[in-house]
């Protein structure tokens, strides 16, 4: 019997495209997009992901995958963190960069956490990836969130300036999905 597709809860077509590109054709399960209005939760990223995943599994009644992305400025002790979506919406890329005007430390961590549940009663598994970098004045395309202000360590370009293929080999999302792919390649993901 074939496994049911995994419902990736997102309304962001670019995110779905990136996830599929990173996982590749050899990934053993089909990933389908499902748009759900889940409650916007507050708290620590692991707790947010677990709760969001269980709520999604109750709605979908099957295997689900949810994602939460954080951008953590070291000078601001981890803020905006899981609230990056709201900061970006209100301030834009220039405003996010300007938040660090008073600090010498422009370093940051991009953090991506995927939560997977096989069903509504299943244990929620977390897969997290991190990329170190710096917050810079916006450069590059503005079609994917805060990519224009995040310059990964060891690079002279922002995520937005890098070719998609290169970004998908080094990003926080890649690192998290690599762990997910490893899980599904082993005994646990069957």
Swiss-Prot record:
<feature type="binding site">
    <location>
        <position position="40"/>
    </location>
    <ligand>
        <name>Mg(2+)</name>
    </ligand>
</feature>
<feature type="binding site">
    <location>
        <position position="167"/>
    </location>
    <ligand>
        <name>ITP</name>
    </ligand>
</feature>
<dbReference type="InterPro" id="IPR029001">
    <property type="entry name" value="ITPase-like_fam"/>
</dbReference>
<dbReference type="GO" id="GO:0009204">
    <property type="term" value="P:deoxyribonucleoside triphosphate catabolic process"/>
</dbReference>
<comment type="subunit">
    <text>Homodimer.</text>
</comment>
<keyword id="KW-0460">Magnesium</keyword>
<feature type="binding site">
    <location>
        <begin position="68"/>
        <end position="69"/>
    </location>
    <ligand>
        <name>ITP</name>
    </ligand>
</feature>
<dbReference type="InterPro" id="IPR002637">
    <property type="entry name" value="RdgB/HAM1"/>
</dbReference>
<feature type="binding site">
    <location>
        <begin position="172"/>
        <end position="173"/>
    </location>
    <ligand>
        <name>ITP</name>
    </ligand>
</feature>
<comment type="similarity">
    <text>Belongs to the HAM1 NTPase family.</text>
</comment>
<dbReference type="GO" id="GO:0000166">
    <property type="term" value="F:nucleotide binding"/>
</dbReference>
<dbReference type="GO" id="GO:0046872">
    <property type="term" value="F:metal ion binding"/>
</dbReference>
<keyword id="KW-0464">Manganese</keyword>
<feature type="binding site">
    <location>
        <position position="52"/>
    </location>
    <ligand>
        <name>ITP</name>
    </ligand>
</feature>
<dbReference type="Pfam" id="PF01725">
    <property type="entry name" value="Ham1p_like"/>
</dbReference>
<keyword id="KW-0963">Cytoplasm</keyword>
<dbReference type="InterPro" id="IPR027502">
    <property type="entry name" value="ITPase"/>
</dbReference>
<feature type="binding site">
    <location>
        <begin position="144"/>
        <end position="147"/>
    </location>
    <ligand>
        <name>ITP</name>
    </ligand>
</feature>
<feature type="binding site">
    <location>
        <position position="85"/>
    </location>
    <ligand>
        <name>ITP</name>
    </ligand>
</feature>
<keyword id="KW-0378">Hydrolase</keyword>
<dbReference type="GO" id="GO:0005737">
    <property type="term" value="C:cytoplasm"/>
</dbReference>
<keyword id="KW-0547">Nucleotide-binding</keyword>
<protein>
    <recommendedName>
        <fullName>Inosine triphosphate pyrophosphatase</fullName>
        <ecNumber>3.6.1.66</ecNumber>
    </recommendedName>
</protein>
<dbReference type="GO" id="GO:0035870">
    <property type="term" value="F:dITP diphosphatase activity"/>
</dbReference>
<comment type="function">
    <text>Pyrophosphatase that hydrolyzes non-canonical purine nucleotides such as inosine triphosphate (ITP), deoxyinosine triphosphate (dITP) or xanthosine 5'-triphosphate (XTP) to their respective monophosphate derivatives. The enzyme does not distinguish between the deoxy- and ribose forms. Probably excludes non-canonical purines from RNA and DNA precursor pools, thus preventing their incorporation into RNA and DNA and avoiding chromosomal lesions.</text>
</comment>
<dbReference type="GO" id="GO:0036222">
    <property type="term" value="F:XTP diphosphatase activity"/>
</dbReference>
<feature type="binding site">
    <location>
        <begin position="10"/>
        <end position="15"/>
    </location>
    <ligand>
        <name>ITP</name>
    </ligand>
</feature>
<dbReference type="GO" id="GO:0009117">
    <property type="term" value="P:nucleotide metabolic process"/>
</dbReference>
<keyword id="KW-0479">Metal-binding</keyword>
<dbReference type="GO" id="GO:0036220">
    <property type="term" value="F:ITP diphosphatase activity"/>
</dbReference>
<keyword id="KW-0546">Nucleotide metabolism</keyword>
């Amino acid at each position: 019997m074939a496994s049911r597709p995994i419902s990736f809860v997102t309304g962001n077509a670019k995110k779905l495209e990136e996830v599929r590109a990173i996982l590749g054709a050899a990934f053993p399960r089909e990933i389908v997009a499902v748009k759900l209005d889940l409650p916007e939760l507050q708290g620590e990223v692991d707790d947010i992901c677990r709760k969001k995943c269980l709520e999604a599994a109750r709605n979908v009644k099957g295997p689900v995958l949810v994602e939460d992305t954080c951008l953590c400025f070291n000078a601001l002790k981890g803020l905006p963190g899981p609230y990056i979506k709201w900061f970006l919406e209100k301030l834009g890329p220039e405003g996010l960069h300007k938040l660090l005007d008073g600090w010498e430390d422009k370093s940051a961590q991009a953090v991506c956490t995927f939560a997977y549940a096989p069903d509504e009663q299943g244990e929620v598994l977390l897969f997290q990836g991190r990329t170190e970098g710096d917050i810079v004045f916006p450069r590059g395309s503005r079609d994917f969130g805060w990519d224009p202000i995040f310059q990964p360590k060891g690079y002279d370009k922002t995520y937005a300036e890098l070719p998609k293929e290169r970004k998908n080999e080094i990003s926080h999302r890649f690192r998290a999905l690599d762990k997910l792919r490893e899980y599904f390649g082993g005994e646990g993901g069957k």
